[in-house]
UniProtKB/Swiss-Prot annotation:
The keyword Metal-binding applies. The modification Phosphothreonine is found at residue 68. It is found in: Cytoplasm, Sarcoplasm. Monomeric heme protein which primary function is to store oxygen and facilitate its diffusion within muscle tissues. Reversibly binds oxygen through a pentacoordinated heme iron and enables its timely and efficient release as needed during periods of heightened demand. Depending on the oxidative conditions of tissues and cells, and in addition to its ability to bind oxygen, it also has a nitrite reductase activity whereby it regulates the production of bioactive nitric oxide. The gene is MB. It comes from Megaptera novaeangliae. Belongs to the globin family. This is Myoglobin. This sequence was the first determined using the Edman sequencing system. Monomeric.
Length: 154
């Protein structure tokens, strides 16, 4: 799967909006993930106690983790598909330490699309959404390949 230069530009244009508030976007995305797929919360020992959206919004740790997640994803997206060096340690930790199933990466991808659309409707139309979906699918496909190399059946 390859994105065109125009598709990558759409992805990076919306990502510039994310970078204006990485932690806030990340927190919103994690809240959307946890509300839509409560089973994902079980993978996060330090967030398991957060039961309500208000508790999640008040959590500085959740905001920090959202910042970490989106900072890593931004670094990967900026590589425009040439993300082998960035992907390897991420796949290693997510497969061997955290044991995050690929399905959960699909869930967070959906949360990313939803939050970007809700926060930036004028800048995240159908073309940009399609490009971001394609970029996230490429990321998941490449992570899945690394998982397989590591013997993780996520």
């Amino acid at each position: 799967m390859v994105l065109s230069d125009a598709e990558w530009q759409l992805v990076l244009n919306i990502w510039a909006k994310v970078e204006a508030d990485v932690a806030g976007h990340g927190q919103d995305i994690l809240i959307r993930l946890f509300k839509g797929h409560p089973e994902t919360l079980e993978k996060f020992d330090k967030f398991k106690h957060l039961k309500t959206e208000a508790e999640m919004k008040a959590s500085e740790d959740l905001k920090k983790h959202g910042n970490t997640v989106l900072t890593a994803l931004g670094g990967i997206l900026k590589k425009k598909g040439h993300h082998e060096a960035e992907l390897k340690p991420l796949a290693q930790s997510h497969a061997t330490k955290h044991k995050i199933p690929i399905k959960y990466l699909e869930f967070i991808s959906d949360a990313i699309i939803h939050v970007l659309h809700s926060r930036h409707p004028a800048d995240f139309g159908a073309d940009a959404q399609a490009a971001m979906n394609k970029a996230l699918e490429l990321f998941r496909k490449d992570i899945a390949a690394k998982y397989k190399e590591l013997g993780f059946q996520g």
